[in-house]
């Protein structure tokens, strides 16, 4: 049976890639299962994807493997694209402030770069290109 993808997942910079290198095979397998759910389910359960209350537009992908808990920070871009920023292994109930600050910084940087690229494209193609 062919899966139908509703969303795509993209990585911004290398922070998520570096985090991923630290994960065990079992955690990676679980992570890819959660990614598949996120890409194919119309409504994603909060068990797997939840907004970060303190930062507008930022979300956390939630992964549990055994007693280990992991969070991958991300955002939506135009509704159907999920941009991955950085990840952590949670060791306490509270998400570390420095990890949230980093994710917020990366999200702002992503949208600033995107806007710059769109402005450059608009300049190159002229005002009537869209």
Q: Where on the chain are the PLM-derived regions?
A:
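Basic, Lys/Arg-enriched alpha-helical interface segments
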Residues: 1-69, 78-82, 90-130
């Amino acid at each position: 049976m062919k899966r139908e993808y509703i969303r795509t997942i993209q990585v911004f910079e290398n922070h998520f890639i570096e985090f991923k290198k630290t994960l065990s095979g079992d955690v990676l397998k679980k992570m890819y299962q959660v990614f598949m759910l996120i890409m194919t389910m119309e409504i994603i359960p909060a068990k797997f994807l939840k907004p970060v209350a303190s930062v507008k537009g930022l979300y956390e992908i939630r992964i549990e493997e055994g007693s280990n808990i992991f969070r991958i920070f991300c955002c939506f871009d135009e509704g159907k694209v999920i941009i991955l920023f950085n990840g952590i292994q949670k060791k306490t109930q509270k998400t570390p402030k420095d990890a949230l600050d980093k994710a917020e910084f990366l999200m702002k940087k992503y949208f600033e770069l995107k806007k710059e690229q769109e402005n450059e494209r608009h300049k190159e193609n002229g005002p009537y290109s869209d």
